[in-house]
């Protein structure tokens, strides 16, 4: 959206003049009203009085932040000169910063996007903006003016990527320039007003060392997972919403050899692979006429024609699970994907359901045979009560016994309690079971110590 259009929208409903009453006192609400009045006055003056040169600065496709701040600052100074006691002088920088964010960024939530400690932003209407920090949800002090203000920011998110939202299509998924995932839903579906959910995209890809330091897994588990990737084991990362599946998938991909051709498929591109030979594919929703949709399933089918060494699907949700399983069963070993499930056993059941959504009449046993021959390992990722994220199970998918897929846990997290700070305590343990796919380790030249799968106590203490 053009800056001038944004300014005009934000400036509507202002008082007919730019005079700001001086309040003697009193409450924080009154002070905030004065601040908002001054800010709206600056909006109004910029729209009405800007020179052609200033208009060029504010309307440029590529705005220079310093020039925009200078233009805004001049008008802020003009208003404060006429009303020196309206707000403290110290608020001058805040006004300039807020107006700059309205013009160059996403308004009130721009500062939250810049905060590296915040991982998720949830706008529930204009007056409630929640954030996730260090795994915990909290109400931020950020607010929008009203529903129209939220809608202006939504338009700012969607316009650059050609997406559209209105009452006839009141929900949309999008992506910010930095790759952060955005979901938007508006009235009449959202009764509290326009809602925005932003899953921030990590600017720097995490390494396995980061996950070890976070307590997501231990060194022995990391060594085993690395060996599995190098031995071309097909892996499913299972977990609930916000459990860290995509982050873990990113780390797993870092173990793939540099000389392999990798095709990634996602709804919204989040993976940050470090290898050179990577092809990134992204699905596309239908346009406003209802045509032009390209699904994950379409992309999986196409990826098979692209001579991939490995296929990575960001998440399977529907019928594409069948195509992914067939890819794993037809020479694309070492492929990776994620799915929403709370336990390894639930993940297998979810895969069954998703295969049925492909629209083919298949016996349940045939589906389970496909799953058991394709998926070899499940990493169960969980978000625990204290906000921490851990790989709680590493489970081998074995074979069919009758009509049941058999599994065995290789590693698991054992919780022992909670400390005085409310942090869960526990440790990772090896169950002592050896996976049945060790032959693939030998075939691919991957070696592990002979006592690697011994229970931790027998192997001479815990392996960290």
Regions found by a protein language model. Give the residues of each.
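N-terminal anchoring/assembly modules that precede and organize ATP-driven motor systems
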Residues: 1-138
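Active-site phosphate-binding and catalytic loops of NTP-dependent enzymes
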Residues: 55-56, 82-88, 104-115, 157-174, ...
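AAA+ ATPase "lid" subdomain C-terminal helix
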Residues: 183, 377-387, 400
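Switch/coupling sub-region of P-loop NTPases
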Residues: 222, 226, 231-238, 247, ...
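Conserved glycine(s) of the Walker
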Residues: 244
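NTP-binding/hydrolysis catalytic cores, primarily Walker-type P-loop NTPases
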Residues: 387-464
